[in-house]
Amino acid sequence: MSGQVRVAIVGAGGRMGRTLIESAYHQEHIRLGAAIERPGSSLVGVDAGELAGVGKLNIMIMDSLDYATDDFDVLIDFTAPEASIVHLDWCVRHKKAMVIGTTGFNHAQKEQINAFAEQTPVVMAPNMSVGVNLMWKLLELAAEVMGDYTDIEIIEGHHRYKKDAPSGTALKMGEVIAKTLGRDLEKCAVYGREGITGERDRETIGFATVRAGDLVGEHTAMFADIGERLEITHKASSRMTFANGAMRAAHWLVEQKPGLYDMQQVLGLN
């Protein structure tokens, strides 16, 4: 799309919400149309630009999407699974597109998203980073060449405030590898090890999780054999990389038909 796309950001007062506001401010083809916080938040009525540190934007934080129906084209949501489902329902009823960066959805919630996406365009990705999405392509190649001959482990680290584990990105890494190898991740995944576990089953894909300090996001996939190992690692040093990816997704999504899309499609990597 050549013109500006108007976005609304829910969870505007959180760490990611403020970063999204800042990112929107700096994007040539994006304009912030609305910023939303939960009812009762002390931030309602605060200027969104001042909250994000980019100066006054004359866009006050509101406590309901109903007040912003005519102010945006695409909703961007990095909140929580239950809230994201509510927001997507609202978008369907008001014919708005939606970018979902929330992680931690259960199976039933994913089914709800699939159903809603039949009625409105949705981009959902556990990680909006360009580098991470390129990493998934590299994992396909590594799995094709080395996967059946190596032990595969996925290690991820995030800040102390992250609520779900393993991260959505780590799970996606496992899904990419398992699919390439013709395995079912639900059956071959091992989440942490403790006690006498016995020898390692070569068919398993292990997951290890670190939660510490202010880690933005670090992910490593290890393909280990006797005598050598390959590690594919992505490290994020700023949330801005995720925010910029979300803006790119919003700009792309506004011209798409109803359906559920991912960042691979946004970036043309499929």
UniProtKB/Swiss-Prot annotation:
State where NAD(+) binds.
G11, A12, G13, G14, R15, M16, E37, G101, T102, T103, A125, P126, N127, M128
Carries keyword NAD? yes
EC number of the protein: 1.17.1.8
Which keywords does UniProt give here? Amino-acid biosynthesis, Cytoplasm, Diaminopimelate biosynthesis, Lysine biosynthesis, NAD, NADP, Oxidoreductase
Q: Which residues bind (S)-2,3,4,5-tetrahydrodipicolinate?
A: H159, G168, T169
Q: What is this protein called?
A: 4-hydroxy-tetrahydrodipicolinate reductase
Q: Which species is the source of this protein? A: Shewanella oneidensis (strain ATCC 700550 / JCM 31522 / CIP 106686 / LMG 19005 / NCIMB 14063 / MR-1)
- Report the locations given in the UniProt record: Cytoplasm
Identify the Gene3D superfamilies for this entry.
Dihydrodipicolinate Reductase, domain 2, NAD(P)-binding Rossmann-like Domain
- One Pfam family this sequence matches: DapB_C
Which pathway does this polypeptide act in? Amino-acid biosynthesis; L-lysine biosynthesis via DAP pathway; (S)-tetrahydrodipicolinate from L-aspartate: step 4/4
The question of whether Cytoplasm is a record keyword is answered with: yes
Q: Which GO terms describe its biological process?
A: diaminopimelate biosynthetic process; lysine biosynthetic process via diaminopimelate
One term of GO molecular function: oxidoreductase activity, acting on CH or CH2 groups, NAD or NADP as acceptor
Residue positions annotated to bind NADP(+) are R38
